[in-house]
Amino acid sequence: GILPWNFPFFLVARKAAPALITGNTIVVKPSQLTPENAYVFAQIVEEVGLPAGVFNLVNGRGSVIGHELAANPKVGMVSLTGSVSAGQQTMAAAAPNITKVSLELGGKAPAIVMEDADIDLAVKSIIASRVINTGQVCNCAERVYVDKAIKETFMEKLVAGMKQVKVGNPNEIADLDMGPLIEASALKSMEKKVERAIQQGARLLCGGHRIGTKGYFFEPTVLDCVTQKMDIIQEETFGPVLPVVEYSDINDAIAWANDCEYGLTSSVYTQNLDNAFKVMRSLKFGE
């Protein structure tokens, strides 16, 4: 099991449990950015009496250790959660042995807000989805398509809600909504993505900047006047940035939602079940 850094303890359990339940051993390689969680997990399974060699832990860079695991002919299956490039490299390494590969990769999840949606519920859900783990989640809402008829009200509530998100160090302050980004390069990436969106014509409604000078904290951000071909719509954004696209025809919203190289998750907000199923059947996403 090759792990990312964004859910470093949960994903150990998610990969280990199916393997162990079905009578297999497992080798876990955590991200080099968050190695201690898997180490603690290994200590726990040792303390509860799991036989030596059933749960195994190795650390190192994915390009080195991950490659060796995927290429090893003794490995029966490789499960990776990570970037698209990491998935491609894993498949290539596993190919000579025709080793089974299971991948969960990047996402650019669209949220479609229809004219009859419960606006308050949609806003609350989308904000929660975008700021959880500071937006560093492959299946959280990354782009919003909202019906023109309700856009003004939706945007007012969305911006107000994003401005109310509590950001800080969870080791120092309780009752927070959002912590820091994973590292300095992630912070720089957010700054560049927002800057690029503005250069391409987007309008910054809130956020868009680093918070303070200590830590990798970034303001919850909303971008308006966004169009389909902008980088902020097409590229995965691992941070608390929400670009919003207006639509007048639901068929356009569906087409734009599908106009993306990712296909992990999506969401639809409507109070009409027929509308929900119609849109769901047309979206080319796994969830």
What are these regions (language model features)?
Residues 1-121, 175, 247, 275:
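Rossmann-like NAD(P) dinucleotide-binding subdomain of oxidoreductase/dehydrogenase enzymes
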Residues 10, 120, 148, 152, ...:
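Residues in well-ordered alpha-helical elements
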Residues 18, 68-69, 125, 196, ...:
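Well-formed, non-transmembrane alpha-helical positions, independent of function
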Residues 20, 27, 56, 102, ...:
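Structural detector of well-ordered beta-strand residues that form the stable sheet scaffold
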Residues 75, 112, 199-200, 210, ...:
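Conserved C-terminal structural/oligomerization subdomain of aldehyde/semialdehyde dehydrogenase
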Residues 77, 85-227, 256:
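ALDH superfamily catalytic-core signature
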Residues 82, 148, 271:
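Residues that line or immediately flank small-molecule/substrate-binding pockets and catalytic motifs
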